[in-house]
Amino acid sequence: MTGKPSDVNQPATAGAVSKGVIFAGYLGGGTIKDCGLADFGTAEDKPPYWAHLDRSESDAQNWLVRESGLPSAALHAILAEETRPRLESFDGGGLLLILRGVNLNPGADPEDMITLRIWAEEKRVISLRRFRIMAVQDVRDQLEKGQGPSTIGGVVTQVIGGLLQRMEPTIQSLQGCGLRSCACDVTSPLSVTP
């Protein structure tokens, strides 16, 4: 790959799914070594691996269903059109996160939330999006500079941190528009009338 990578579909190595792969590679030393999905696996002798996919692309969906090895319940949740934010753990150590963030893409309304779906295991993380997620791009940029995470937990933590950081100004503006006046005092006793 030449030039600075961006959050667009990048070609994968020969024999791999190329349409729908935004980036995929091995983590190590704060960097990512691009290799596409051809070399993706769960072998213990391989370094941690991160694949970021466009979930709207049928090639990416087919790869997930046929080759990723994700449990069927996780596949159903990660590929669903309608989702809710959640965290689920699976036997064998897998973790499914479905997160929401503010849509800061050009021309978008920040109130239109974007969804990031993450499957994380000890040695690999698969993230999926439909619309560009700047928090993911930030982590990718840090990896390109050699200053990124080297572990799966580090990737997930930094992506979540980026989502939260970008949500803060929108939340602050909502608080300034009267959100505080809608809050209830959770320390006072409830009064229920039949």
Positions of PLM-derived features:
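Peripheral, non-transmembrane regulatory/ligand-interaction domains of membrane transport proteins
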Residues: 1-194
